[in-house]
């Protein structure tokens, strides 16, 4: 059974990153000591390391460690072994392209179908439909397919 929280945004006016979601995330990820973060959407073009550090600061408030998928030698194994997964927002075209280039679209799909707790914000929620064809993001790259999870 799928165990997903899909949020249209990570930040609401006057609040810090994920602040409005943290109480729900503490419950959603209650059995997770660490969460695998997929920073591929890269809002504003920030680096994977910068984005991951930003997410670490937010999740530290609920005592959950964040590990960026880019920090692993094998992204497939990282997803398969993840206690929980978070895909952040940014550009959906870039995110989907990276998921295909790293050969993890189907691996991620299987993890979610098998109940791995998942959070997707913005682009990270866009990929949870059948296709990404409703996104209004700028097509800065062209993925090999618009098919998503």
Predicted feature residues:
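Short, glycine/charged-enriched secondary-structure capping and boundary segments
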Residues: 19-21, 50-53, 99-103, 133-136
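Phosphate-centric recognition/catalysis
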Residues: 91
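N-terminal beta1-alpha1 cap of cysteine-dependent amidohydrolase-like domains
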Residues: 1-88
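Short, conserved acidic/polar surface loops in the N-terminal third of protein domains
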Residues: 48, 78-80, 95-99, 130-131
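Short acidic (Asp/Glu) patches
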Residues: 68-73, 101-104, 108
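Class I SAM-dependent methyltransferase SAM-binding "motif I" and its flanking Rossmann-like core
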Residues: 96-98, 105-149
């Amino acid at each position: 059974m799928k165990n997903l929280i899909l949020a249209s945004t990570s930040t609401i006016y006057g609040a810090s990153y994920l602040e409005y979601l943290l109480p729900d995330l503490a419950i959603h990820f209650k059995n997770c000591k660490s969460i695998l973060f997929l920073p591929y959407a890269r809002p504003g073009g920030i680096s994977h390391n910068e984005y991951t550090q930003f997410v670490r600061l937010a999740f530290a408030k609920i005592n959950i460690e964040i590990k960026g998928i880019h920090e692993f030698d094998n992204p497939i194994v990282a997803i398969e072994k993840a206690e929980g997964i978070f895909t952040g927002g940014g550009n959906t075209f870039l995110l989907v392209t990276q998921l295909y280039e790293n050969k993890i679209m189907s691996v991620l799909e299987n993890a979610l179908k098998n109940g791995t707790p998942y959070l997707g914000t913005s682009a990270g929620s866009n990929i949870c439909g059948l296709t990404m064809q409703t996104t209004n993001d700028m097509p800065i790259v062209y993925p090999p397919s618009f098919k998503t999870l």
